[in-house]
Structures are given as C-alpha cells and as structure tokens.
Curated annotation (Swiss-Prot):
UniProt lineage: Bacteria, Bacillati, Bacillota, Bacilli, Bacillales
SUPFAM superfamilies: Nucleic acid-binding proteins, S-adenosyl-L-methionine-dependent methyltransferases
Broad EC category: transferase
Organism expressing this protein natively: Bacillus cereus (strain ATCC 10987 / NRS 248)
Presence of the UniProt keyword Ribonucleoprotein in the record: no
Protein name per the record: Uncharacterized RNA methyltransferase BCE_0542
Length: 459
C-alpha cells in the first residue's frame, strides 16, 4: 500500500497525460492525475493534454502543456504576439463567448466551496463587452534598453527580462500611442534609462492614462531623481507629437522596489489633472488617483449595483469602502442620503470634493471603518436601508460583517472583484439574508478576473 501511494506522486520533470476538468480562479486548466490535483496554465476545459510537472506543492502540483492531444472547440489563436511571455492576459487563447461562460463557472465553483447547493440557479450569465479589446485606460510599462533602442514592457514572470510590448491589445489605443511617442523621444534625446540589474539610470517607468470620454491623455515619467536632462525639449516634443497629452507629470522613486510610484509627484507641463466622465458624473484624475480601469464596463457594473439597490428615492444608503465615492454618487440622485467611509483619508477628501462638484447635498463622507461609524450612527437614530460594500480582493472585514448582521438593513448590495472572498462573506451574511441573485460582470476581458454584483435581501 505504501509503495502504491508513493508511485502515484508526481515528480518535477515528469510528463503525464491529463484531461482538463475546469478552469481555476487564475485562468489555469485544472486536472487530476492519480487523484492529485494539477494546475496547468494554457490548458482549457475538456482538453486532453500531455503535461510536464514544473512544481510540487503540498496538496497540488503545477505543470506546463507539452502537447495538446485533443483541443477544445473553443480554443483560438491568441492575437497578441507576446501573449505567452507577457502574462498580463490569461485567456486570449479562449473564444470570448466561452470566456464569459467560464467566468460564470469560476463564480459557481467559488460558491460551491462554501455552500452545498452552490446557488447555481441564482448565478446569472456573465455580462461581457461588445468589443473586448483596447479597453484599459491606464498602462504602467517599465523602460529598458535593447541594442541601443529604448523599449517598454513588462518583466517576464520571475525574471529580469523585459518583454518589449510595442502595442498592447487590451490597452486603449491612445495609451499605446502615448507610450510609443514618449519612448521614441527618450531615445532621440538619449535620456538615461534605468537598468534594473545594475540599479543605475534615470527613467524607470512610463505611466499613461487616457480619459476615454474626453480624449485627454496624461503621461507620468517615473525617475530615480528629480533632474531631467533636456526637460524643455522633452516637453515640447511630447506636446508637438501628441497634442492629446494635456498633462505631463514626473514622479521620483529612488527606492530599490517593484512599487511603481515614489512619494514625490510634480507637474512638468500642462494640467495637474485630466477630466473623465462616467455617465453623468465627471472626475478629475491626478497622476496617482485611483480610477476604474475599464470605464465602459464600470458603467455596466454600477448600473447593476443600482438595479440591485432598487431605490425609490427614500432610502438611506451606506457606501462602505467608498474610495473616491464613485458608487455612492452613482446612487445619490435616487436616494434620500448616502453616507460613505474609507480608511484612506485622501480618498475621503476626493469623495467630498467629487460630491461638492456635482452639487450633491445628500452625501456625507468620513475617514475610518464602517464597523466604527455604523453603530455610532444607529445610536444617533440614523439607520440605513441599504448597505453597499465594494471591498478589496481580501473581502469584507469580519467586524463589518458582524455589524451588518446587527444593524440588519433591508438590503445588502455586494460588489466584488474576487469570487472566493465573495462566496465566503455571502455565506456569513446568509444567517440573516437571502441571496436574490449573483450577476457576474466581465471588467477585464482575456484575463481570469471576474467582478460580481450580489443582491442580498433580509429574511
């Protein structure tokens, strides 16, 4: 028996046949070899592949595809030339309609892990994009040199090798163009480029952001020090070659770190901010401001949150994890009052500014945690009808879930970017709430990410 058990264990470098059962949460194929779970990036459900083990972990193994014996009918040729090296997308080799089906399945699996019935009949089809390309409004590409040429891209996974990305197929065309213009000018002016291995040089990263609705573009150079040689010439060239660039910024980050931004940001030319609109709302975006990366699908996501809240105009709403106030402001016209909180004081300052600029008088924003503010407000006689949560990937704080169960608003609208933490939190809320439906939304086509809006109603 012991001998048999030993035989069934995989070893690094071993090749073996495997049938792919489903997609994992990171977009990898999941199969079983002699009852051991194996994660295989690039393999698709229903495929029969020959895989080679690359890593053994406790309870699972990782492998790579050596050969596809039987391909999925949904397998397509990834249009991006650096798709397999870059790692930014995980699902370009899967037909887009099937990506939407598989993302729903990822959500179903997450709920099955925490609940027996998995709520499958309540999980709706994923809302996708008509055109799932060139949707991202912001890029952060590292800068390097290759044979005297300036290149921009991302580091190959677990290496110092920079993959040259001349044209990213999920980036907005204007962000691609701005990056191309800037790298061309840096090369022409022979500006010093940071060398990651030697940790020497000046320009580290080019960050570009496009306001999709207004067409304004912002370029931020991340440098190791403040002095920028040929600064005036650089500015003049950028403005001449791409008039859409309305804001040229510089950020200084001298630390040996993979964190992009340093502490000091200042304007080189143009405006400090660019203007963007979402529906009827407009936002000022500074170099470091958080803003949703896919504005088109953000409108879809927020409209789903609005539908789930089912507002009549009389509701008091709490917007927990409110950030710069976007979801709350999206609902404010149809609510009696919106109160939001966030642990980041700068975000609260922006939320107040955004509310004021739009003329809202029924909003209130406080720095701190929802689990601190909510009991205080209830004590003062202010009780919410709807609580909207849009937490980070780790999900809601346990104390917030306990507070929601104590305060018992009529409805909870849960906006999530991580199906695993969503399913865990929803299970906790089901002590007092019933799930009416789960609506997956595809915010990032060709990646494994899936957002969800869940409507929970008090029992």
């Amino acid at each position: 028996m012991i001998q048999k058990q030993h035989e069934s264990k995989l070893e690094v470098g071993q090749t073996f046949p495997v049938t792919i059962k489903r997609l994992g949460i990171n977009g990898e194929g999941v199969g079983y070899f002699k009852r051991q779970v194996v994660f295989i990036p690039g393999a698709l459900p229903g495929e029969e592949v020959v895989a080679e083990t690359t890593k053994i972990q406790r309870g699972f193994a990782e492998a790579k595809v050596k050969k596809v014996r039987k391909a999925s009918p949904h397998r397509v040729k990834a249009p991006c030339p650096v798709y397999e090296e870059c790692g930014g997308c995980q699902l370009q080799h899967l037909d887009y309609k099937e990506q939407l089906n598989q993302k729903r399945d990822i959500v179903v699996q997450a709920f099955q892990k925490y609940m027996n019935n998995g709520l499958e009949e309540k999980i709706r089809p994923t809302l996708g994009m008509e055109n799932p390309w060139h949707y991202r409004n912001k890029s952060q590409l590292q800068v390097g040199r290759k044979d005297e040429k300036v290149i921009t891209g991302l580091y190959k996974q677990n290496s110092h090798q920079l993959i040259d990305i001349a044209h990213c197929m999920i980036q907005h065309k204007a962000t691609n163009e701005a990056t191309k213009v800037v790298r061309r000018i840096l090369e022409k002016l022979n500006v010093s480029i940071y060398n990651e291995k030697k940790q020497k040089g000046l320009v580290r990263t080019i960050v570009t952001r496009t306001a999709v609705q207004t067409g304004e573009v912002q370029v931020t150079l991340i440098t190791t020090k403040e002095e920028l040689p040929n600064k005036e010439q650089f500015i003049a060239e950028v403005q001449k070659q791409m008039p859409a660039v309305k804001s040229i910024m510089q950020n200084v980050n001298w630390r040996k770190t993979s964190v992009i931004f340093g502490d000091k940001t200042f304007k080189l030319a143009g405006k400090e901010v660019i203007q963007e609109t979402l529906g009827d709302l407009s936002f000022e975006l500074s170099a470091r401001a958080f803003f949703q990366l896919n504005p088109e699908q953000t409108v879809v996501l927020y409209n789903e949150a609005k539908k789930a809240a089912a507002l009549t105009g009389n509701e008091k709403i709490v917007d927990a994890y409110c950030g710069v106030g976007t979801i709350g402001l999206w609902l404010a016209n149809d609510a009696a009052e919106v109160r939001g909180m966030d642990v980041i004081p700068e975000a609260i300052a922006d939320a107040r500014k955004n509310a004021k600029r739009h003329g809202f008088t029924n909003t209130k924003y406080e720095a701190g945690k929802a689990e601190q503010w909510l009991p205080k407000w209830v004590k003062e006689g202010w009780r919410p009808d709807v609580i909207v949560v849009d937490p980070p990937r780790t999900g809601c704080d346990d104390k917030l879930l306990e507070t929601i169960l104590k305060v018992k608003p009529k409805q909870v609208v849960y906006v999530s970017c991580n199906p695993s933490s969503l399913a865990r939190d929803v299970q906790a809320l089901m002590k007092s709430y019933e799930v009416e439906y789960v609506q997956p939304v595809d915010m990032f086509p060709h990646t494994a990410h899936v957002e969800n809006v869940v409507k929970l109603v008090r029992k």
